[in-house]
Amino acid sequence: MVSLSDRLDYIVGAKAADSLDEVFGIRTVDDLLRHYPRSYTKGATVRGAQDERPEAGEHITIVDVITEAVTLPMKKDSKKKYLRLTVGSGRNKVIATFFNAGYISKGLTKDTRVMLSGEVGFFRGVMQLTHPAFLILDSPDGRNRGSSSLRRIADASQAVSGEVLMSAFERRFFPIYPASTKLQSWDIYACVRQVLEVLDPVADPLPADLRAKHGLVSEDEALRAIHLAESESDRRRARERLTFDEAVGLQWALVTRRHGELSESGPSAPPRSDGLMAELMRRLPFELTEGQREVRDVLSDGLAATRPLNRLLQGEVGSGKTIVAVLAMLQMIDAGYQCVLLAPTEVLAAQHLLSIRDVLGPLGMGCQLGGAENATQVALLTGSMTMAQKKKVRADIFSGQTGIVIGTHALLQDAIEFHNLGMVVVDEQHRFGVEQRDQLRTKARTGIMPHLLVMTATPIPRTVALTVYGDLEMSTLRELPRGRQPITSNVIFVKDKPGWLDRAWQRILEEVAAGRQAYVVAPRIDETEDPQKGGQNSRPSETADGLYARLRSGELANVRLALMHGRLSADEKDAAMMAFRAGEIDVLVCTNVIEVGVDVPNATIMLVMDADRFGISQLHQLRGRIGRGTHPSLCLLASWVSPGSPAGRRLCAVAETMDGFALADLDLKERREGDVLGRNQSGKAITLRMLSLAEHQVFIEAARDFCTRAYEYPHLGLAPHPGLADLAARFIDTDRIEYLGKS
């Protein structure tokens, strides 16, 4: 008999096993049985005159007599031939085409009774099948001839007389699998049938009481029913069980990672009443919100503990995450540790340097004239710095003079040595992976696992928080600091109302005349980038270079413009941002390089060109660059799509709410599940086969509860079955999280 871990070549044959491995990476019985059907089709039928016609793309299986069989030359190469069959007549006529037919044409002749199976198309109202699977049902010598998959099923179900038993094909439903031209659905079905006929009863990885609590069928029943059950209710119960399996596997991988990190020793840093953190609290020119105080206290308690803190801080744009992180870093510095803040771009890293130095004042001027007695240093380390600059920063870090190091990916590759690293802060977590944030933690002293705080201004749906970030505890800032100004958002559908775009340029001029500043955002840098990337129409999208050149002599000819995008050198980007921040530039023409972290309080209006080319979360992030000062702000989303299109409705949804959490839920419903989890260490995408983060919150929460209790409280009798590790296997080595990077 056969178990789930057995290789397929001993069961289905080397040729079929090699094809499954080559096309889908399917190697074992478990791999094959978890290659679930994508849909189901009715069994083989003789179509009647009154039968409803199938829809294009539907998988059909028909039995009928060939009324015409013609071999014709290919148009592009007359030496090559193709076979065209006509079966049935009238509205049920089907034309089947076989290219490079060769030996196929010998058996498929007029008046032969055949079975054809494939995806149906239509041409001039006639049903079409291209290279369908086929089976000759009245072969003169009684041998089964046809596609290997159908032939194998026919051979296995043949009567003593040699006649094909049609009952094998007349089931109410057949599974339709994700397939390819090389490996069709019938091929996969034949292998599945062959495996299930010899498969031993499958041991259940979940305890009986858990299955009973959630009304789940057994693993063995589910794996068989998902492929062979003819009843939809049986298939539904199988899907529920296999969905729960996937939720448990994912949560077990996450709880294993989480507790693996917690087993390390963390740098304990109790708060000091005479330290930098307490002094900054006394000097702050504003009051923290209630939410900020709560998160500060949670972080303070975590930093004082002897196990490493692992926490995600999410909050709306402008909710004040940075000051909370600064207070946490000062608590670590008070205890003799250093901190590193990892930012995704040099623009954001430079912004953090300015804002943190500004909020610290003399407390951040260590070894400088005018610095406080116990002041620390704040330093920047990026890839564009000169070797001499990097050498000076490295020396101050190694000596311990620098308490807060701010940098980009350069921190990961740089030969930097810390005097005593105690905390890693990662800003905009979705731009980094697990392996990158952990790479910094390895720069601490042996035996110490630095505390970890990761931050994002992109709100995260609860189901994503429980999965993608399931190895982290979570804090949320929803309350905006007092004084944040409202942002009005409007969509400009340019095709319908071209005059509104003219008015948008006029509004920018009005804001500039009032002494304020503006952003104009384009989806591309220049014409070398794919004009259709993310688009829904044939019109090439705007470019930052093109807009900048046009606006200088056109709509914004009389204002001071600057250009900002990712291909500029670090010095050019710094110069543009410094000039814009200083008020020397009126309008910044840019790409989404300003999506995160850029803080210019005097900027009050933003025009996003071809807004449909941006994701929901990107638009919400971009909009957060305005409304940061004392004046009400306006965000205009210009698009050439129609209002009723999916892209148009998405833009309207963004314009109608400033609730980033509501937009995050909408974003999750629209994206493919495969974008959520990222890739494993071999680079293969981690995809969800059954589990939907948008639809299965109940399953995800139940799985998290079970896995957490089973891991943390084995004395309660929740010790997991051995099969849990198998469910978690494809998630356990996930080393790169990409959920929000694709938003």
Curated annotation (Swiss-Prot):
A GO BP entry is: DNA repair
Domain Helicase C-terminal spans what residues?
Answer: 520-694
Motif stretch (DEAH box): 427-430
EC number of this enzyme:
5.6.2.4
An MF annotation (GO) of this entry = ATP hydrolysis activity
The catalytic activity, as recorded, is: Couples ATP hydrolysis with the unwinding of duplex DNA by translocating in the 3'-5' direction; ATP + H2O = ADP + phosphate + H(+)
Gene3D superfamilies named among the record's database cross-references:
Nucleic acid-binding proteins, P-loop containing nucleotide triphosphate hydrolases
Record keywords: ATP-binding, DNA damage, DNA recombination, DNA repair, DNA-binding, Helicase, Hydrolase, Isomerase, Nucleotide-binding
Cite the residue spans of the region called Disordered. Answer: 524-545
What does it do? Plays a critical role in recombination and DNA repair. Helps process Holliday junction intermediates to mature products by catalyzing branch migration. Has replication fork regression activity, unwinds stalled or blocked replication forks to make a HJ that can be resolved. Has a DNA unwinding activity characteristic of a DNA helicase with 3'-5' polarity.
Protein family: Belongs to the helicase family. RecG subfamily.
Q: What is this protein called?
A: ATP-dependent DNA helicase RecG
